[in-house]
Amino acid sequence: MDEINWKDYGVDAESAAFWDKYNAAVESAAEREKEAAPKLESDRIRKYCNDFRIFYADLIGEENAEKLLSDVPDNKRCFDEIYASLLRCIHDQKAESNRRIASILLKYAPKTRGNENAAPTV
C-alpha cells in the first residue's frame, strides 16, 4: 500500500478542530466496541474492518474515507497498517511542532540559566 498523505485529508495535529473530530471518532469507535462480537472469526474481522471504515468516515468525511479505503479488502492487517500510518503522521506533526517551538525559544527567548544559547535581549 502506498504511503497516505494524511494532510490531504485534513489531519493536522496542531488544530483544535482536528482533535475535536479525532476525539469524536474515537468515542464513537469505543461505543461500537461494546457491541457483542460475532461468533465466526471471518465475521469478527469484517466487523473490525467496518468499525475502522466508520472511524475514518467520522474523522475525514465519508467521501474521503470511501476514496481512501475503496480498494482495501476486509483484512485486519491492512487496517492496522492504515491506522499505524495515521498515528505516525500525527506523531511526526507533533514532533515537528515541538522542534519548531524549541528553535524559536532557542533563538528568541532571553538568555537565562540553562538557555545560554538564546538570543540576547535588547
Regions found by a protein language model. Give the residues of each.
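A generic structured-segment signal
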Residues: 35-36, 41-73, 79-85
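Alpha-helical structural motif
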Residues: 14, 18-25, 48, 52, ...
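C-terminal charged interaction modules
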Residues: 66-122
